[in-house]
Regions:
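Conserved SAM/AdoMet-binding glycine-rich loop
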Residues: 100-187, 194, 201
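Short, positively charged and aromatic/hydrophobic N-terminal segments
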Residues: 7-10
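Auxiliary Fe-S-binding modules of radical SAM enzymes
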Residues: 13-30, 34, 39, 236, ...
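N-terminal [4Fe-4S]-dependent radical SAM core
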Residues: 2, 12-108
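Glycine-rich tight-turn/loop motif centered on a GG-T
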Residues: 178-189, 253-261
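Short amphipathic alpha-helices and their capping/turn segments at secondary-structure boundaries
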Residues: 89-95, 149-163, 194, 223-233, ...
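Conserved C-terminal portion of the radical SAM core fold
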Residues: 190-249, 265-279
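Conserved, mostly hydrophobic/aromatic
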Residues: 63, 111, 170, 237, ...
Length: 279
């Protein structure tokens, strides 16, 4: 079973005849260097959230592929303050001896674990403000569900977007209803569309997450998802290879009735074709 951790984040821009550094697509790394003059690193944070797909509002099982950590397995402990998590994340980057580490002066504070807008508004304000006010944080990025962007949350994000750029990362995964039902996404495509429009109207940048290789999906299905999001007013897309993680219901399904998991070559091929659908 192939379980690569590879992904590609594409910053969506109009296609032209030039190369973006050494790539033929506009990568997030290229965009950040163009904006800030050097590499920007993401620090994963855990705000102590849960998810309506876990607490019983929608379901109690979570999305079928989601780990016990709510996809925040690389975040620091939620028992630490946000500032402490940022400082720990900085030390991890230094410890890895990343290239051009002397330039590490700006970070993306990324609320990654569970649903990053699913909490009382006062708590969200406190968490986000602590992150965005950190002197070395350049961008506040929040992973969330499209159905967890109530008007008061949108107003808060708009307010913070005046201090530093705010990104919202939406877990769409697929546009196909049958797939959405299987992975227990818990909301229809129309909710995603409305969330993107609401964020766009407020000048908040949106990154859409898509999983390539979901069970039952063909190459044409994946390309249809890529084509759909390419026509939305979003600024980026993260193409993620399907992970079959131990302890998830997806892993149980795989053990009981193994499904095809993309090989590295298949993933590379479909990823290239998806990128070609970007504007």
């Amino acid at each position: 079973m192939h379980k690569s951790t590879g992904y590609a984040i594409i910053y969506v821009v109009r296609r032209n005849a030039v190369l973006w550094a050494d790539k033929r697509y506009h990568s997030l790394d290229y965009e950040m260097k163009a904006r800030y003059g050097h590499k920007i690193y993401k620090i994963a944070l855990d705000g102590g959230f849960t998810c309506p797909n876990r607490d019983g509002l929608i379901d109690t099982r979570g999305c079928i592929f989601c780990s016990a950590g709510g996809s925040g397995d690389f975040a620091a402990s939620r028992n630490q303050s946000i500032t402490e998590q940022i400082e720990e994340g900085k030390q991890l980057l230094v410890g890895k001896q990343v290239s051009d580490s002397s330039q590490v002066s700006c970070y993306i504070a990324y609320f990654q674990a569970f649903t990053g807008t699913y909490a009382p508004i006062d708590r969200l304000r406190a968490l986000y403000t602590e992150a965005i006010r950190h002197p070395e944080v350049a961008i506040l990025s929040i992973a969330t569900r499209p159905d967890c962007l109530q008007p008061e949350v949108l107003d808060l994000l708009s307010e913070l977007n005046q201090i530093k750029p705010v990104w919202v990362e939406l877990g769409l995964q697929s546009i196909h209803p049958q797939t959405a039902a299987y992975i227990r996404r818990g909301y229809p495509l129309s909710v995603y569309d409305a969330a993107v429009l609401n964020l766009h109207e407020r000048g908040i940048e949106v990154i859409t997450h898509v999983i390539l290789g979901l069970p039952g999906e063909t190459a044409d299905d994946m390309l249809a998802t890529a084509d759909y999001i390419a026509h939305q007013p979003i600024q980026g897309v993260k193409f993620q290879l399907l992970h079959v993680l131990k302890g998830t219901d997806l892993y149980t399904d795989y053990l009981q009735q193994p499904f095809h998991v993309l090989t590295l070559e298949e993933y590379t091929d479909i990823l290239i074709r998806c990128i070609e659908h970007m504007p």
